[in-house]
């Protein structure tokens, strides 16, 4: 009973409830109080402070919410002070306000100090009723004689900057409204049109565009840049480095790289003559002269491909009068100009050699070989089957020459039935008489020996 009586007497002596009632009668709805459980938990007092501008809200550019946590030992203990939702104040200003309010609280220990703390906060805001920071549109600070405005959400802009922003947003909203007109007509629920919003917090803006446009444009101070000695030294060093890299090809020219594959059609290139083209006037020359000119021409030698390992071609003398000289000349030119092609079949023509003395060696293992008829008269000397190099229209095997007189690849072998015409004296069923075995020029066991003798003689 005695403890409860002492607690009741202590609560009656506590000055906080009576002080809160006085504050509520002064600030009315601006003050919010969260009462604790007697003296066991602290009370919390919230109040939003503005500069004293004779209730002219348009001239109030700064504000903050003051929070006081009153302990149970109040007034013999200082309340905990904090600031929430500051507008137009820098961090340094907020820190200064907290320090000033702390000094006031310590000076009023043992007495009612809540009213003094609230009024001191208002006084500081009145003295600093200039927004601190930058215009978020132009990113420049506010000067004393510049025309700026404050939104209901306590964000600050130059009047000229805000007018330009509002005009731009109205044009965008108009364009979006035209695009979404059909969607709004078919929509079941009508969406409320959204006006111009604050560029910081997206709250709807209330503005007078005419008055904002009439405001003068803010004059920003022009700061002349003066490089220091260190910056000038660095510029010279980078300039020398750039020149050195450019001389060594380390700098990529974007314009040159962009136009590397650009083809201009204003100046057409000169028509290039085909390298494989042969003058028509050379057609009247004999094949030997034409072959010599083609072999000595550097253009033809550079364009012709390297010779391929093809089988040696053997061309026998044809019966004179079978073809005209003009056709032979055309075939000679075609064989010299066309590159050699490998054989399409799986087999390759075996290499044949014509040894000296007129002996003709046939490949081993061939059964259906055609032998030449015996001569009518006695054979006085061996007949050389090699054609003359300057015979008209006759193609011979390529002759081996020095390394500096290469005449191109050997002519391509063409399977032309016209070149191997049947003689007029032969009939479809006739054949050449065969020689007895062992009496011909062919010796089965002497092929390798004859080849070895040729290599030793160097012929």
From Swiss-Prot:
Task: Give the boundaries of each RING-type zinc finger.
Answer: 135-202
**Binding annotation for Zn(2+) 2:** 153, 155, 198, 201
Q: Name one GO biological process term.
A: protein ubiquitination
- What's the chief localization of this chain? cytoplasm
In this UniProt entry, the residues modified to Phosphoserine are 450
Consequence the record notes for mutating residue 137 to A: Strongly reduced E3 ubiquitin-protein ligase activity, slightly reduced binding to UBE2D2
Quaternary structure and partners: Interacts with UBE2D2, and may also interact with UBE2E1 and UBE2E3. Interacts with RELA/p65.
The record ties this protein, via PANTHER family, to: E3 UBIQUITIN-PROTEIN LIGASE RNF25, RING FINGER PROTEIN 25
Task of the protein:
E3 ubiquitin-protein ligase that plays a key role in the RNF14-RNF25 translation quality control pathway, a pathway that takes place when a ribosome has stalled during translation, and which promotes ubiquitination and degradation of translation factors on stalled ribosomes. Catalyzes ubiquitination of RPS27A in response to ribosome collisions, promoting activation of RNF14. RNF25 catalyzes ubiquitination of other ribosomal proteins on stalled ribosomes, such as RPL0, RPL1, RPL12, RPS13 and RPS17. Also involved in ubiquitination and degradation of stalled ETF1/eRF1.
Recorded protein name is E3 ubiquitin-protein ligase RNF25
Organism of derivation = Homo sapiens (Human)
């Amino acid at each position: 009973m005695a403890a409860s009586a002492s607690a009741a007497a202590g609560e009656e002596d506590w000055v906080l409830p009576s002080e809160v009632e006085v504050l509520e009668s002064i600030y009315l709805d601006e003050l919010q109080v969260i009462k604790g459980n007697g003296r066991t938990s602290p009370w919390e007092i919230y109040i939003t402070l503005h500069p004293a501008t004779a209730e002219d809200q348009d001239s109030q550019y700064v504000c903050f919410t003051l929070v006081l946590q009153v302990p149970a030992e109040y007034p013999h203990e200082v309340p905990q002070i904090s600031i929430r939702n500051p507008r137009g104040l820098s961090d340094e200003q907020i820190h200064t306000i907290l320090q000033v309010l702390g000094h006031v609280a310590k000076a009023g220990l043992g007495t009612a100090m809540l009213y003094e703390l609230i009024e001191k906060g208002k006084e500081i805001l009145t003295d600093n009723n200039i927004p601190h920071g930058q215009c978020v549109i132009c990113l420049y600070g506010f000067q004393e004689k510049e025309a700026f405005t404050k939104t209901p959400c306590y964000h600050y802009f130059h009047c000229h900057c805000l007018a330009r922003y509002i005009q731009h947003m109205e044009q965008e909203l108009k364009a979006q409204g035209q695009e979404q007109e059909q969607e709004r007509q078919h929509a079941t629920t009508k969406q409320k049109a959204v006006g111009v919003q604050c560029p910081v917090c997206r709250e709807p803006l209330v503005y007078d565009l005419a008055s904002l446009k009439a405001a003068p444009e803010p004059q920003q101070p022009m700061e002349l840049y003066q490089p220091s000695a260190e910056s000038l030294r660095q510029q010279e060093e980078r300039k020398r480095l750039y020149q050195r890299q450019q001389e060594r090809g380390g700098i990529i020219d974007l314009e040159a790289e962009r136009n590397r594959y650009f083809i201009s059609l204003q100046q057409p290139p000169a028509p290039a003559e085909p390298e494989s083209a042969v003058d028509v006037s050379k057609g009247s020359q004999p094949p030997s002269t034409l072959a010599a000119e083609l072999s000595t021409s550097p253009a033809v030698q550079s364009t012709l491909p390297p010779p391929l390992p093809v089988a040696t071609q053997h061309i026998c003398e044809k019966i004179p009068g079978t073809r005209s000289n003009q056709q032979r000349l055309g075939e000679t030119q075609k064989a010299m100009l066309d590159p050699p092609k490998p054989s399409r079949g799986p087999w390759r023509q075996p290499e044949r050699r014509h040894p000296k003395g007129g002996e003709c060696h046939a490949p081993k293992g061939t059964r259906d070989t055609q032998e030449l008829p015996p001569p009518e008269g006695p054979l006085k000397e061996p007949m050389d089957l090699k054609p003359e190099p300057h015979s008209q229209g006759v193609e011979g095997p390529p002759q081996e020459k020095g390394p500096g007189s290469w005449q191109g690849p050997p002519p391509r072998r063409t399977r032309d039935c016209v070149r191997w015409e049947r003689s007029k004296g032969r009939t479809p069923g006739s054949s050449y008489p065969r020689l007895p075995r062992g009496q011909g020029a062919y010796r089965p066991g002497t092929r390798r020996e004859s080849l070895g003798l040729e290599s030793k003689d160097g012929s």
